[in-house]
Amino acid sequence: MYIGCDLFSSSIKFQRIDKLTLSKIKKKIKSDKIIEVIPEKREQKNLDKVEIYWGNRINSNLIKKMPNLKWIHFASTGINKDIYEQIKKKKIKVTNTQNLYSSAVSSTVLSFIFSLARGTHYCNFLRAEKKLNRFHFDKISNSIQDVYFQSILIVGLGEIGNKIAKVCNSLGMEIFAIKKKSVMKKPKYVKKIFQLKKLKKAVSGKDYIVNLLPVTNNTKNIFNKNLFNSMKKNSIFINVGRGGTVNERDLLKVLKKNRISGAGLDVMVNEPISMKSSFLKLKNVIITPHIAGVTNNFWDKQISLFFENLIRYKRNSNLQYLKNFSNIKEGY
């Protein structure tokens, strides 16, 4: 069995399979053959033999060159929705790695919450300006908050959202959530679940709003001036979903005017962010370069999940994190 993989050529260390990891994989696959796929390359050998594809960069042109393709496993939570028509037509199975990021992303969200609420991020600015003293810190003292027993709205109560909710619940926080499917049973640690169409009402009065939404026709620019103006003045907005769900011009305005207290942004519309971006000048904003899911044991988890599914695939059993076609059409 041939397995095509595009995870060898990334210039970023945590996004590629290194030699040590590859040796572990080869020991596991035994009789199967894994071949490197470079999507940008026109001519490649053995694509017509590939039955399983493992990676993030598969596209419609590649699928056309792989007539025997039966299963695609994305090494990410996001899915390339441009391949929707082809995989539906050919009935190709699609899985992703949504559960691998929950601990890392929830840790990032908590770091945003504590840094912005306690003003520790601001101390880095004071340090750079050689003003690291109580007198200068006093300028933001009115925005300093006690995290415990505050309220949080989690917009997207999936695998990652539930992990965040559980951690915040342990801090005594009041948990509210947005869930696309309103027919779910409410977890005991969540006080109330809203439908997405009630988002404006849901953000009102919450201390923290955490966005986990993917970009779809219904969510593009959903966080705009109307939503930001519905938030309480000392609220903190956190985005670890997708940059395209936020109208960045509107967000920039409310942050400049201190209409909300601050923001923690791991994702932007354009990545990497331009060093000329006005967001970088704001002291009430923390920006990270889309690294919320990074962790030093990622590949151990990734390999474990892929090979568990490979065993299931060979046994013709149900695959973990199998996506339905409606999810794929939306890109998640």
Where are the predicted features?
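Phosphate-binding beta-alpha-beta segment of Rossmann-like dinucleotide-binding domains, i.e.
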Residues: I92-S151
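Glycine-rich Rossmann-fold phosphate-binding loop(s) that bind the pyrophosphate
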Residues: L157-G158
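N-terminal Rossmann-fold NAD(P) dinucleotide-binding loop
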Residues: G161-N162
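Rossmann-like dinucleotide-binding domain for NAD(H)/NADP(H)
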Residues: N234-I236, V240-Y332
